[in-house]
Regions:
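Core catalytic DNA strand-manipulation module of type IA topoisomerases
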Residues: 1-174
């Protein structure tokens, strides 16, 4: 998960090379923040799994399809780790109507950060984004504002239990 401080220079070069080598990173401006992954005190037996400089030179051409998927995942996770944080503004509005209290929540993305890389990586590999929810954006509101005949709808949803552990997820949870 972390690298040591003596690896910062080579990792910065590696990240620059990966941005050029990965097709889904074309046109993406990445300001790598290596301080997020560089911590000598958290490296115990081995530093984080990183692609090699040799891979940046050769690319995906010599890899089998399953190896390409794995390498793409490793590269994407490294780029997500050094990318800007995902920032959003969350708004909760509380309304009272006819003696009942209603709540509306909205979220506006300020900086997509690492989520942009994850989204592009998933799209390139053909995966669906499991966490993708439509962003609920609230209109501009002011305290004490009144509404005439607002449109309303009731939505009913069911919760889902957590997914069952597989052998891999059980080991990683332990």
């Amino acid at each position: 998960k972390y690298i040591t401080s003596d690896m910062e220079g080579s990792t910065k070069e590696l990240i620059t090379g990966l941005c050029a080598a990965l097709p889904f990173m074309q046109g993406v401006k990445l300001q790598a923040d290596l301080a997020r992954i560089c911590d000598n005190s958290k490296v115990t037996d081995h530093h984080a799994i990183l692609p090699t400089a040799e891979f940046v030179k050769t690319g995906f051409s010599s890899l089998a399809e399953s190896e390409k998927k794995l390498m793409t995942l490793v590269c994407a996770k490294l780029l997500c780790a050094v990318a800007a944080p995902y920032e959003y503004e969350a708004v909760t509005a509380v309304f009272t109507c006819g003696g009942y209290t209603f709540t509306a929540k909205g979220r506006t993305t300020l900086c997509e950060g690492w989520r942009e890389i994850e989204r592009l990586s998933r799209a390139a590999s053909g995966e669906q984004d499991e966490d993708a929810e439509p962003e609920a954006v609230l209109p501009p509101l002011a305290e004490g504002q009144t509404f005439d005949n607002p449109a309303a709808e009731i939505s009913e949803r069911y919760t889902q239990p957590p997914k069952a552990f597989t052998e891999d997820t059980l080991l990683s949870a332990m």
